[in-house]
Amino acid sequence: MSPFTDPSRTDAGTDPALDGPDESLRRSLGVGRRRFLSTCTAVAAGAVAAPVLGAAPALAQDRGRGHGHDHGHGHGHDRGQVLVPADKRGIILYTVRDATARDPLASDLPSGFREVFKQLARHGYRQVEFAGYNQHANAPGGASLESVKGAKLLRSWLDDYGLRAQGNHGFIPSSWPLTTEDTETFKKHLEIANILGMDHMGTGGDPTGSSYRADWDVAADKWNALGRIARREGIKLYTHNHDGAYGFLLDGGPLDDQGRPTRSSGIRKLEYFLKVTDPKVVWLEMDIFWAHVAQYKFHSYTAHDGSTRKDVFDPAGLVARNNKRYPLFHAKDGVVSTTNGMGYDMVPFGTGVIDYRTFFSRVGERNYHNPMIEDDNSPSATDPAQSLREAKISYDNLAALRKRC
């Protein structure tokens, strides 16, 4: 992969003997020498290239220690400005979905929305992103809180524990043109979002799974229409990404047997979506983990003329160029994997190699973006306390991030 130049890095060595091609690569990647050399060794030994772009030593601390304060002294990683202010530290509740779904009558662990809110607030979180409004039937409020009454109850608990709802992965109509039924359901979810005090409402899926421009044009028309409805209710509508959405759009070259293009101009799908949607009504939530998977997987394309061209995705660069379009992030981490085809295995935030210090330093606007901790794998069938315990580890590591001086 070709590296991107990272102007935020200032800790590169100055020994002339180290200023060869490998040192230039290391600097541009924003990787410490030890990590760079070990990664290069692993790549040389393996059949599949390991992802190195954005890699950095993990921020994991001893699991018994916390870093929930915004102090700027002490350890080396505490020097400089806090990268994620305390009131911007959030978590998507999908990460602790086993806890909200747990039967409070069968466990002493926090169970249901109210007790989970209480525990997350104790960890230090100030924001949450919903992933639906269902919990265990024995929890206060009952199984479904997807109603005006349920939203008012949820809001009261959020207020009790000093939490703010910042978004939801919820209902996005499947119909297009919109049916009356879907439109009314969508408006009901906007009403719930307003009761909960959300600025944003969205989805956990991509606008479309297609690789073709025509389908992305349809998706843009639909999202523009939905975004206008949401804006009238004071809500910013956002979409999400997995790795495929930052793959390359097929928009030219020879046609296949169904009349579809087979080659690319080099524009990525969600980059095209950014261009053809109205910035006043459509926003995006970057899942930074999946964006790095896309960086690993989609680093070259076949151009219209049949040539192969290299183009390494730069997630932080895309956000920096479109900062106000990305009010939300999913912040989840990964360790290098050369066997799963993605380049990374998910781990709790701060215990992997994705360089969040550099990412947040480069995108800036720390009082605008809302990073939500996510770990798809935190719930455990054998360790019911794991997801909330790892939520604390992730919070501490998010709070520990400091901008380099």
Name what the model sees in each region.
Residues 111-133, 196-197:
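Catalytic domains of carbohydrate-active enzymes, especially glycoside hydrolases
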Residues 230-348, 353:
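Acidic/histidine-rich catalytic cores of soluble enzymes
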Residues 53-94, 98:
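C-terminal segment of N-terminal export signals and the immediately downstream linker at the start
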Residues 103-120, 179-191, 311-318, 356:
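Short, acidic/polar
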Residues 19, 23-30, 35-58:
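N-terminal export signals
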Residues 41-42, 46, 159, 173-283, ...:
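Active-site acidic/histidine proton-transfer and metal-coordination neighborhood
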Residues 1-31:
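N-terminal secretory signal peptides
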Residues 80-85, 117-122, 143-166, 185-197, ...:
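Acidic (Asp/Glu)-rich catalytic clusters
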